[in-house]
Regions:
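N-terminal low-structure segments adjacent to metalloprotease catalytic domains
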Residues: 1-113, 367-396
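A long, hydrophobic alpha-helical segment
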Residues: 3-6, 228-234, 246-247, 254
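Short hydrophobic alpha-helical membrane-anchoring segments
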Residues: 10-19, 234, 254, 258, ...
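Charged, low-complexity, helix/coiled-coil-prone segments
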Residues: 48, 68-91, 164, 186-195, ...
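Short low-complexity stretches enriched in small and charged residues
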Residues: 68-81, 118-124, 203-207, 228, ...
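Juxtacatalytic substrate-recognition/specificity segment
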Residues: 108-240, 351-353
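Acidic/His/Gly-enriched intrinsically disordered linker/tail segments
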Residues: 187-204, 218, 238-396
Length: 396
């Protein structure tokens, strides 16, 4: 009887091996596919599917059940290659000159495409890798700066793109035709998810069909301002306009030389920026008329845009820079803790108005906050005179 049972078991095993050999081999010879799942960590992680999935969508269904609700700030689609610092840096510099790859040079179509590690540049004229390498330092260094600041902005290309996109126009007429605001040296289009820059803003000019470097262009502040908007593309719809513009103004105000940002002298750079916007020199200090904090906090996008052709624009940009600088370097323990907490709260879905109440004002009324701000700036040689315009006031 035992012998008969053993023979029966052997027969069953042989039948299984005959019927299912391919299925076993196929699972053994391939890696399990992966499904992207969002977690509270903004870096997209890959969850391997179990190889014995019996239904085509079972792994996807499992990941959907395990994944938390989507964040308000869309997490990057790919892991960031540079992590934010814990403390504010005094200097941020590229390790070397960016490597440039020629993607295509179509003379008939008038389309020339070049790439550096984090950007793709489409041009309407053949610039060549040496010229691209010259201005790419500003792009790549601004990416590095926004990655490293303790704000942890996690810059990432727009959805469905692996690289940030830049459109370089060879002349000012082509730049204007692309929709450039009058007098602009560059702009970021949220609709196209692309930065538009005239070659003249990059220290490049075309002479008789030849591309030449223009040594008279010494400042990259407008370009860096607009690149910073691109670095914050995921945040733009969710943050108050004073903060998105203030962050871009801060980056543009920093001393930038040959791929290197110097942040250790930002107080001096701030005063220089304010003087450029009309501040009066008072001995070793500067005096500037800043929009009252309550009105600044209440400014929305349409109101900001409506003031772009008026004297309010100058005051708006300078006031946004001053408030952002204060939150980065002077508020409370001077460690940007309130700003960082505000960003993390918005990242998790809290409306920015409430995040400002909870982490920026942090129990202070706008007038009290303003008083503290004035004292802190006076300590570094910036005298603020807060002015009213009669606009809406933020409700604490």
């Amino acid at each position: 009887l035992i012998l008969l049972v053993l023979l029966a078991l052997v027969g069953v095993v042989l039948w299984i091996m005959r019927e299912f050999p391919r299925r076993e081999v196929s699972f053994a010879q391939r890696e399990a596919p992966a499904v992207a799942a969002r977690s509270l960590d903004p870096v997209t992680k890959a969850l391997p599917l179990v190889a014995v999935t019996t239904r085509p969508n079972e792994g996807m269904d499992m990941a959907a059940k395990l994944a938390p609700l989507p964040l308000q700030v869309e997490p990057p689609q790919q892991a960031q290659d540079i992590q934010a610092l814990k403390e504010w840096p005094r200097e941020v510099a590229l390790a070397g000159t960016p490597e440039v790859t020629i993607v295509s040079q179509d003379t008939q179509a008038g389309e020339f495409i070049y790439r550096t590690p984090h950007f793709e540049y489409s041009c309407d004229a053949p610039l060549g890798p040496d010229v691209v390498r010259h201005f790419a330092r500003a792009f790549e260094a601004t990416y590095l700066l926004n990655c490293l600041l303790p704000l942890d902005l996690k810059p990432a290309p727009e959805p469905l793109r692996k690289l940030f996109q830049a459109r370089i126009l060879s002349n000012d007429a082509a730049f204007a035709a692309a929709g450039a605001p009058p007098g602009s040296g560059g702009f970021y289009s949220r609709g196209d998810k692309r930065i538009y820059v005239p070659a003249s803003s990059l220290g490049v000019k075309l002479v008789g069909g030849r591309v030449m470097l223009d040594q008279s262009v010494e400042s990259n502040d407008t370009l860096i301002h607009e690149i910073t908007h691109q670095m914050m593309s995921r945040w733009l719809p969710l943050l108050p306009v004073w903060l998105t513009e203030g962050a871009a103004e801060y980056a543009g105000a920093a001393d930038f030389v040959h791929g290197r940002f110097f942040l250790g002298q930002m107080q001096d750079r701030l005063k220089q920026r304010l003087r450029g916007r009309g501040a009066r020199q008072m001995g070793t200090s500067v005096r500037f008329a800043m929009l009252k904090v309550g009105e600044l906090l209440a400014l929305d996008g349409p109101t900001w845009a409506a003031g772009m052709t008026t004297a309010a624009a100058n005051e708006n940009y300078a006031s946004a820079l001053l408030l952002t600088f204060y939150l980065y370097h002077l508020d409370r323990a001077a460690d940007a803790a309130g700003m960082i907490a505000c960003l993390r709260a918005v990242e998790q879905g809290l409306p920015h108005e409430q995040a400002v109440r909870d982490f920026i004002l942090a129990g202070r009324r706008p007038d009290d906050f303003e008083r503290e701000m004035g004292l802190a700036f006076a300590g570094i040689g910036v005298e603020l005179q807060f002015t009213r315009r009669g606009g809406e006031v933020f409700k604490p």
